Regions:
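Extended, compositionally biased flexible segments
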Residues: 32-73, 79-80
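Asparagine-centered strand-capping/turn motif at beta-strand->loop junctions
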Residues: 80-84, 198-199
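Conserved short histidine dyad/triad with adjacent acidic residue
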Residues: 7-11, 21-38, 140-156, 190
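Structural motif
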Residues: 50-52, 77, 87, 161, ...
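Short acidic-glycine-tyrosine-enriched beta hairpin
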Residues: 57-75, 174-191
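A short, N-terminal "cap"/entry segment at the start of jelly-roll beta-barrel domains
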Residues: 1-24, 34, 65-66, 85-139, ...
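Short, conserved beta-strand element in jelly-roll/cupin
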Residues: 26-27, 37-53, 143-148, 155-173, ...
């Protein structure tokens, strides 16, 4: 049930099958967003605003705010409301059916970005909100910071979706380039050579979710031409 909330699917990497599905959710003040996580579980991130999350229609509500990450195991119920003036804007990524491990928690779990340690790979920094050994055994959610410039082309062994939170840049992948700005969403299939270039003066800040889980630093560099 959305009751005034707006839900928009921006990417489905499996065309309705075993892929990652990214949705953007906007909950105005005075509205609510409730339901249950899909069969593979869902990773959420608060892009803007603040509000409250209850586990289903009962249970104690917890506050969520900008830069809060959430892991909802398969079938976990939720009810979200927005504080005034609103709206509460959420990123939601559904994992493939069967991805959620039976041993994962049965209720929603929260992770605050500011509480997570900074990790470094090359000149890029990231913080992992959820991943194997950190609340979600089957997928990883992280926020990365890319300084101005272009890194070497590389690929990853996992299936990844990236949402630009701040900054501007260019995605170099395949046979073409794609401009990036806040709200841009891209799919990086396993093994596809690519590079995210920061063409601005400030930091390019991105939200990544990939499956199966692991480290965002795991990559293979493309051979020199």
């Amino acid at each position: 049930m959305t009751d005034g909330a707006r839900v928009r699917t921006v990417l489905d990497t499996g065309a309705g099958r075993d892929g990652l599905v990214r949705r953007l959710v906007e909950v105005p003040a005075g509205s609510r967003f409730e339901g249950a996580a899909g069969p593979g579980g869902e990773l959420w991130f608060v892009i803007a605003g603040a509000g409250w999350l209850s586990p289903g229609t009962a249970g104690q509500a917890v506050q969520v705010r900008r830069d809060t990450g959430l892991w909802l195991p398969p079938g976990a119920g939720y009810r979200v409301s927005a504080d005034r003036p609103g709206p509460l804007r959420l990123d939601s990524v559904s994992l493939p059916a069967g991805a959620g491990a039976a041993g994962d928690a049965t209720g929603p779990r929260l992770s605050e970005l500011a509480d997570r340690p900074v990790e470094v790979t090359g000149d890029r920094r990231f913080r992992v909100l959820f991943g194997p050994g950190n609340g979600c055994s089957t997928a990883t959610q992280f926020v990365g910071e890319i300084p101005p410039g272009r890194a070497p082309e590389h690929s990853h062994p996992y299936d990844e979706v990236v949402l630009v939170l701040e900054g501007e840049g260019v995605l170099h992948a395949g046979t073409g380039d794609r401009p990036l700005a806040p709200g841009s969403c891209v799919h990086l299939p396993p093994g596809e050579p690519h590079c995210l270039e920061n063409t601005g003066r400030g930091t390019l800040r991105v939200l990544g979710v990939f499956h199966p889980g692991g480290s965002p630093a795991s990559k293979q560099h493309a051979p020199a031409s």
